[in-house]
Amino acid sequence: DMGYTSVEAANYNDGKFYGKTPQEFKQMVEKSGMTVLSSHTTHGLSDEELASGDFTEALKWWDQCIAAHKEAGMEYIVTPYLSVPKTLKDLQTYCDYYNEVGKRCQAAGLKYGYHNHAHEFQKVEDKELMLDYMLQHTNPEYVFFQMDVYWVVRGQNSPVDYFNKYPGRFTMLHIKDHREIGQSGMVGYDAIFKNTDTAGVRHIVAEIEKYSCPVEESVKQSLDYLSLIHI
């Protein structure tokens, strides 16, 4: 009833979402008047897989994962986190891995992306910024980026600068703040929303991780702010 239209899940495990089957989860969301949009989940590579560059076994996990997400009605699967790799070779292996995951998602009618935090603005081997390397070495046909604008700012960078440097790569945005959206004043939302066409944005996801009031009021305040700036 507040005005939110879709849900992004973050609890996929062994074929289920929050302990529910894909169909049960889909029905629960739709009963609330919303649709299932996306999900945060991932499967990391072992040291052995990184050393060999062979991630065949890891892809078997994704086959089940993709099937469950498709059954739940998801449009997008997003990897929410990757620690800073020790070497550029390891980072390249992850880029190759993500390209293959994205290819499998595409074959199933889904899209695959990566969500940043602040640590991706560190350099790997003191040579390459992690996020830039990933943007440059993943295939836009298979991998989009879900920019978390709060973490970009916390990483001392400008979301709009990244929109201009890598146009069309940011299919989704995580709109987030220190607490309720818009309260800290540290994120320049006006400039961000004026440049969404350049970024390639199709969906905006509101995320509130910390609350200064009861959760229902917190998410309402965040939506009220977004509505105020005409989102």
Predicted regions and their residues:
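Long hydrophobic alpha-helical segments typical of transmembrane helices together
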Residues: 185-226
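Acidic/histidine-rich catalytic cores of soluble enzymes
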Residues: 6-7, 105-193
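Conserved small/polar residues in nucleotide/adenosyl-binding loops
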Residues: 229-231
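Acidic (Asp/Glu)-rich catalytic clusters
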Residues: 1, 18-38, 61-73, 96-107, ...
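A cross-family glycoside hydrolase active-site/sugar-binding cleft signature
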Residues: 8-10, 37-42, 78-80, 113-115, ...
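Acidic-and-aromatic substrate-binding clefts and catalytic sites of carbohydrate-active enzymes
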Residues: 9-22, 43-59, 83-92, 119-125, ...
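Conserved, mostly hydrophobic/aromatic
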Residues: 7, 29, 69, 112, ...
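Active-site acidic/histidine proton-transfer and metal-coordination neighborhood
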Residues: 47-144, 216
